[in-house]
């Protein structure tokens, strides 16, 4: 049953506690399907009932990874490419310069905070075609109440078919046990859904996956993750946009490829099996 208060701390805990008590003879796997829900689960892991399984990293690590600037520093450490990036900080002078041409991409560093402050022309990602438009949209975002950083990036040319998506699962010990790379053929093109994948086929790339494995295991990452990637034909490199600390909206491509995403959690946390 839908409730608009479910993404608030108190109501979330009240709802989860009630469900756990109602099913106290069962093991309950708690899965978040959006960034705000995943953050709530991670933040309150220690307060959850004993029969609830919450397969997520600690909140401090999750919160830092949600910040795109932190993620790009990790990319540099592990040789993972990402687009040319300028981080605009709230209150910064508007006379800054960027080292790449228009059009550019503009998006919030903290998407959870961003969606908490809706406005009529709000988009998930903006394609900005001039400096005048950039200044105008930045002002509009901050006037709506968002107060964190904004990410301005080089726009990588190419349509939906240049996109890739990488999903993985890491066990309790921080070891990657499953990786599945998908080649995106079509995305959604609505203001709030831009960038969500609609059609995907699997297409492995061992070198790319190896770099990501090293990054995740260095972090001792636990649970599902999802990367958005785009192939840059200008230099032949795959550029990483961000990490989602959860399974993706379109993750059925993983199950369809033979990796049942539910099975990994159930076998490890419910049946206590060691994943191969």
Name each region found by the language model.
Residues 23-66, 81-84:
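A short, GP-enriched loop/loop-strand-helix hinge that lies immediately N-terminal to
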Residues 1-19:
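Glycine-rich, highly charged phosphate/nucleotide-binding loops
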Residues 273-276:
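Cysteine/selenocysteine-centered motifs that mediate thiol-based redox chemistry or coordinate metal-sulfur cofactors
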Residues 62-151, 172-173:
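Active-site nucleotide/adenylate-binding loops and adjacent lid/helix of ATP-dependent enzymes
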Residues 236-246:
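A short beta-strand motif that forms the metal-chelation/ATP-contact edge
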Residues 19-27, 99-100:
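Glycine-rich phosphate-binding loop signature in dinucleotide/nucleotide-binding domains
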Residues 153-154, 222-234:
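A short glycine-rich, hydrophobically flanked beta-strand micro-motif that places a catalytic Asp/Glu
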Residues 123-125, 129-132, 136, 154-220, ...:
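ATP-dependent carboxylate/phosphate-activation module, predominantly the ATP-grasp catalytic core
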């Amino acid at each position: 049953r839908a409730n608009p208060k479910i993404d608030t701390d108190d109501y979330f805990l009240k709802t989860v506690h009630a469900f756990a008590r109602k099913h106290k003879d069962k093991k309950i796997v708690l899965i978040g399907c959006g960034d705000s829900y995943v953050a709530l689960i991670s933040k309150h892991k220690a307060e959850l009932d004993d029969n609830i399984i919450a397969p997520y990293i600690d909140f401090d690590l999750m919160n830092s990874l949600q910040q795109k600037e932190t993620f790009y520093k990790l990319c540099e450490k592990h040789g993972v490419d990402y687009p040319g990036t300028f981080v605009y900080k709230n209150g910064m002078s508007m006379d800054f310069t960027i080292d790449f041409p228009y059009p550019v991409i503009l998006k919030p560093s903290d998407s959870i905070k961003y969606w908490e402050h809706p406005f009529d022309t709000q988009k998930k990602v903006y394609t900005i075609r001039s400096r005048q438009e950039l200044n105008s949209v930045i002002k509009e975002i901050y006037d709506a109440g968002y107060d964190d950083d904004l990410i301005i990036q080089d726009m990588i040319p190419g349509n939906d078919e240049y996109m890739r998506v990488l999903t993985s699962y890491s066990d309790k010990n921080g070891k990657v046990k499953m990786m599945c790379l998908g080649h995106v053929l079509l995305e959604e093109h609505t203001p709030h859904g831009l960038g969500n994948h609609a059609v995907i086929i699997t297409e492995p790339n061992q070198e790319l996956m190896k770099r990501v494995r090293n990054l995740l295991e260095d972090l001792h990452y636990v649970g599902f993750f999802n990367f958005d990637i785009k192939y840059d034909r200008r230099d032949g490199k795959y550029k990483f946009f961000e990490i989602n600390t959860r399974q993706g909206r379109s993750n059925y491509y993983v199950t369809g490829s033979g990796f049942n995403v539910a099975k990994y959690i159930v076998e490890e946390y419910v049946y206590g099996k060691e994943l191969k």
